[in-house]
């Protein structure tokens, strides 16, 4: 059967991040979700499956580089800057995806952008970062998935089969390799 657990200690996202961080170095992990917050978990071994029938996408480091011009480790910084309407998080005024990508390319991460805001060439962006620094730091704390919560099950306790069909066979059957 399928393992089930409940908690009031953390969100499910934290457990998913915990599994990705704990097991992603040594095994392939595929997170099936439309929640873009999981993009920050992507590594060479951890990918995000966004199932949409014929438009199914497996999000990898290359996908993030192509789509956003950032590394997966910068995704929480990116969303902190641009905001996330689905989570009611307001980013910095005048900072859209292209500007956020450019700032991250130049400064590396959100904290460096804030600390070096005076070096931002465009005055309206510089002023927005300075004015919104506290909110941007709060955004980061809300968006960043740490994955440090105790996990309810080990991977050995989580195998799933149904009528002799393994999870991998099901995924291959829908075109996920």
Show which residues each predicted segment covers:
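Extended two-metal-dependent nuclease catalytic cores across DNA- and RNA-processing enzymes
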Residues: 1-153
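S-adenosyl-L-methionine-dependent methyltransferase catalytic core, i.e., the SAM/SAH-binding region
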Residues: 162-164
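Long, highly charged low-complexity segments enriched in Glu/Asp and Lys/Arg with interspersed Ser/Thr
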Residues: 168-177
């Amino acid at each position: 059967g399928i393992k089930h657990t409940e908690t009031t200690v953390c969100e499910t996202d934290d457990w998913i991040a915990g599994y990705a961080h704990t097991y992603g170095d040594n095994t392939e992990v595929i997170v099936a979700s439309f929640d873009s917050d999981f993009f920050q978990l992507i590594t060479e071994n951890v990918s995000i499956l966004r199932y949409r029938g014929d438009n199914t996408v497996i999000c990898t480091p290359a996908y993030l580089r192509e789509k956003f011009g950032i590394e997966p480790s910068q995704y929480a910084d990116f969303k902190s800057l641009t905001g996330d309407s689905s989570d009611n998080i307001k980013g910095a005024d005048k900072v859209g995806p292209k500007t956020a990508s450019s700032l991250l390319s130049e400064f590396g991460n959100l904290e460096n952008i804030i600390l070096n805001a005076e070096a931002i060439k465009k005055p309206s962006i510089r002023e927005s970062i300075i004015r919104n620094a506290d909110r941007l730091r709060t955004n980061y704390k809300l968006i960043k998935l740490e994955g440090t919560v105790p996990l309810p099950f080990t991977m050995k306790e989580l195998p799933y089969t149904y009528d002799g069909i393994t999870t991998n066979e099901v995924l291959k059957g829908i075109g996920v390799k």
